[in-house]
Amino acid sequence: MPRLFIEEGFDQVGPLYCVKSKHREGVEFINQDLRSEVPTCLFDLILCRYVAFTYFASALQCKVMARMFERLRPNGYLVIGADEKLPAIVPEVVSLNGQPHIFQKIGGLQSAKRNFRREQRTSISLLD
């Protein structure tokens, strides 16, 4: 990583580097078991490198992939490992600038409306 990025983005704490607090504001870091848990919110960016598409069986890869794209906002990004491949073609997803491991969910107005309605239902059910 370029030295400038390290200086601007991280604080050194002993031998470790921590993301500066100004960059953590408004960001939610979640550690979950992809095989069973599904986040309840929508994401702009999902980083899933060298886990699901490397070690899971193909049926489970498809299930996890579907869950990820369901929870990804329209125009959001999924980044997988450089040596990984998605197990299936996803119609609403394109490879970003020809990068085989960076994907963008393309969703027009209909997709955005579906996601908005889904968020509304989730919010209402949480209040019940």
Predicted regions and their residues:
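Extended basic-aromatic, gly/pro-enriched interface segments that bind polyanionic ligands
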Residues: 1-47, 51-57, 86
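Short, solvent-exposed loop/turn segments at secondary-structure boundaries
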Residues: 57-60, 91-93
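A short glycine-rich, Lys/Arg-flanked "PGG" loop and its adjoining helix->strand segment in the class I
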Residues: 61-74
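Conserved beta-strand signature within the Rossmann-like core of class I S-adenosyl-L-methionine
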Residues: 74-82
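Conserved Class I S-adenosyl-L-methionine
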Residues: 1-20, 85, 89-116
